[in-house]
Amino acid sequence: MPQLNPAPWFMIMLMTWFTYSLLIQPKLLSFTSMNTPSNKTTSTTKPTPWTWPWT
């Protein structure tokens, strides 16, 4: 079964991924984030307990 022999296609797959990552990575890193992170602390609210009708 030729599918079990990784020699013919494994290097092609690796080179394709390396090529795509080298071409796409600069494009993705050039995007700027529109929402700047803030130092605001998150406030947690305490939930009210559920009143069960049968208790």
Curated annotation (Swiss-Prot):
Gene Ontology BP term (one): proton motive force-driven ATP synthesis
Function: Subunit 8, of the mitochondrial membrane ATP synthase complex (F(1)F(0) ATP synthase or Complex V) that produces ATP from ADP in the presence of a proton gradient across the membrane which is generated by electron transport complexes of the respiratory chain. ATP synthase complex consist of a soluble F(1) head domain - the catalytic core - and a membrane F(1) domain - the membrane proton channel. These two domains are linked by a central stalk rotating inside the F(1) region and a stationary peripheral stalk.
Source organism (scientific name): Coturnix japonica
Keywords noted in UniProt: ATP synthesis, CF(0), Hydrogen ion transport, Ion transport, Membrane, Mitochondrion, Transmembrane, Transmembrane helix, Transport
Name this polypeptide is given: ATP synthase F(0) complex subunit 8
First-listed, main subcellular location of the protein, grouped into a coarse class: mitochondrion
Higher taxonomy: Eukaryota, Metazoa, Chordata, Craniata, Vertebrata
Highest taxon of source: Eukaryota
GO cellular component: mitochondrial membrane; proton-transporting ATP synthase complex
Bilayer-spanning residue ranges: 8-24
GO molecular-function term, one example from the UniProt record: proton transmembrane transporter activity
Pfam family membership, one: ATP-synt_8
UniProt key word Transmembrane: yes
Subunit structure: Component of the ATP synthase complex composed at least of ATP5F1A/subunit alpha, ATP5F1B/subunit beta, ATP5MC1/subunit c (homooctomer), MT-ATP6/subunit a, MT-ATP8/subunit 8, ATP5ME/subunit e, ATP5MF/subunit f, ATP5MG/subunit g, ATP5MK/subunit k, ATP5MJ/subunit j, ATP5F1C/subunit gamma, ATP5F1D/subunit delta, ATP5F1E/subunit epsilon, ATP5PF/subunit F6, ATP5PB/subunit b, ATP5PD/subunit d, ATP5PO/subunit OSCP.
Entry keyword annotation includes Transmembrane helix: yes
Membrane topology recorded in Swiss-Prot or TrEMBL: Single-pass membrane protein
Family per record: Belongs to the ATPase protein 8 family.
Annotated compartments: Mitochondrion membrane
